[in-house]
Design a protein with these regions (language model features):
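Small-residue (G/A/S/T)-rich helix-start motifs and N-terminal tracts that mark the onset
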Residues: 1-132
Length: 132
């Protein structure tokens, strides 16, 4: 249930989505596995902002994505941050951008404003153009 300060504006967004997109909420086959439901890459997480990528990746898992990668714009991966979410796979942003098996991308969650963040974004936009 999502709410607003105005009681008349509250709505159950999942129920609304189920009505608008019934295929997304159909029961999954017993013979399926996480690879059946696509691979999402969430790129961002500059130093000190790892939580943004983890939150987005966690939301993707709850939303039904199959495999979810979290790509961090940091020299060292924040393994401690991800300890509670072992189902989310880790990589640096550069490692993740080199993968060819990603079905969809999310870029910018906690990416920051530094030069390395700009390079990550430029690389991501180039990849999107090349793979379109």
């Amino acid at each position: 249930m999502f709410t607003s300060p105005y009681r008349s504006k509250n709505f159950d967004s999942l129920q609304a989505a189920a009505q608008q997109f019934p295929r997304l909420f159909a029961p999954r086959s017993e013979r399926s596995h996480k690879g059946t439901y696509g691979t999402l890459a969430v790129v961002g997480g500059a130093e000190g902002m790892s939580g943004a990528v983890i939150l987005a990746a966690t939301a993707a898992m709850y939303g039904g994505c199959g495999k979810v990668w979290a790509g961090f714009n940091q020299a060292e991966l924040p393994f401690a941050v991800i300890a509670a979410r072992p189902e989310i796979m880790l990589a640096t942003a550069a490692q993740l951008q080199a993968r060819s098996d990603v079905s969809a991308w999310v870029c910018g969650c906690g990416l920051g404003l530094g030069e390395s963040s700009l390079r990550v974004l430029q690389n991501q936009l180039t990849l999107a153009h090349e793979r379109a």
